Amino acid sequence: MFSHITVLKEESVNGLAVKPGGVYVDCTLGGGGHSERILTALAGEGHLYAFDQDEAALSFAAEKLSRFKENITFIRSNFRHIKEELRMRGVDKVDGILFDLGVSSPQLDEASRGFSYHQDAPLDMRMDQSASLTAREVVNTWPFAKLHSIISRYGEEKFSKQIARKIEAYRLKQPIETTGELVDIIKEAIPAPARRAGGHPAKRTFQAIRIAVNDELGAFEDALTDGFELLNEGGRMAVITFHSLEDRLCKQMFKEKTKLPDLPKGLPIIPADQKAPFALITKKPIVANDEEIKANNRARSAKLRIIEKEKQTD
C-alpha cells in the first residue's frame, strides 16, 4: 500500500502564501500531502500542477485528491522539465512552486525498488521505472575513479576510496546483483570502529548511488533555474531538502537571486533605488519541531527555505 507522511506540510504551504485563484506547482507529488493542503487553500479556485515520475504515486494521489479533480493536473515527468511541461499546457507564469526533495517513504520501504539497505532486493534505485540507468549498472560498469568520485561527492563518505576499491575487486569475480550483496561489500570496506559509529554503514554510499542513478542534483538545479523564471512577481518558491548537498545548492542559488544586479561602474544610481530580483522569506531554514520528529523520524533532517520574487518598479 502507498502511504507517506508529509514533512513540514503546514510550514511549507503557509510559506507559499497560497491565494485563491492562483496557479501553483507541486514538483514532488509523492503521497499528495502537500498538494492536498494547497488545493484546500485554493478553495475551489485556481489550479495546481503536480509532478511525479512514479506511476504508483500518481495513481494513489489521483484517487486521494479526486474531490479536487477540476483544480489539479497530474504530470508524469521529472521536475527538471517543469518549463516545457507547463508551456505544453499553456502556462507561462505561476504564483508558487513547491519542492519536497525527500525520497517518498513507499519507494524506500518497498524492497523491490532497491533503495533500501535494510532489505535485500535487486539493485535498481530508479525513481522513474521507465529510465534505463539502474544502480546495478552503476555498481558493475562504472570505473573505479567515477565510483570513488560519486561516493565521495554525493555520499560525503570518508571511506569512499576503500568502498570503490572493494566494489571493483568483488565485481571482477561476479556481478553484484542485490542490495544485500552491496551492503556486505560496503561493510567489509569500512574499518570496524567506523562501522560501529553513527548510522548504518551503507547509508552514504546508497545515497550517492541513488543521486547518480537519478541525476538528482542536476535535475534540481535545472528545475530551480526554470522555476525562478516561471514565478510571477510576488510569487514564492518553497524548498524542503533532506541532505547537505541539496541544501547547499538551494542556499547558494537563493543567495545569487537575492543579490543586487550588477551595474556599470560610474553609473549615477542611488543605492536605495536598486532592488534584488528576489527576497528571502526565511533568513534561516525552518526545521521540524520535536513533535513532528517524534511522529516521523525522517523529518529530523528536513530544512525548508522560501524565496519570493520581488515586484519590480518601472
Swiss-Prot record:
The gene is rsmH. HAMAP family: 16SrRNA_methyltr_H. Keywords: Cytoplasm, Methyltransferase, rRNA processing, S-adenosyl-L-methionine, Transferase. S-adenosyl-L-methionine binds at residues 32-34, 52, 79, 100, 107. It comes from Shouchella clausii (strain KSM-K16) (Alkalihalobacillus clausii). Specifically methylates the N4 position of cytidine in position 1402 (C1402) of 16S rRNA. This is Ribosomal RNA small subunit methyltransferase H. The keyword Nucleotide-binding does not apply. InterPro entries: RsmH (IPR002903), SAM-dep_MeTrfase_MraW_recog (IPR023397), SAM-dependent_MTases_sf (IPR029063). Its main location: cytoplasm. One of its GO terms (molecular function) is rRNA (cytosine-N4-)-methyltransferase activity. Pfam families: Methyltransf_5. Its EC number is 2.1.1.199. It catalyses: cytidine(1402) in 16S rRNA + S-adenosyl-L-methionine = N(4)-methylcytidine(1402) in 16S rRNA + S-adenosyl-L-homocysteine + H(+).
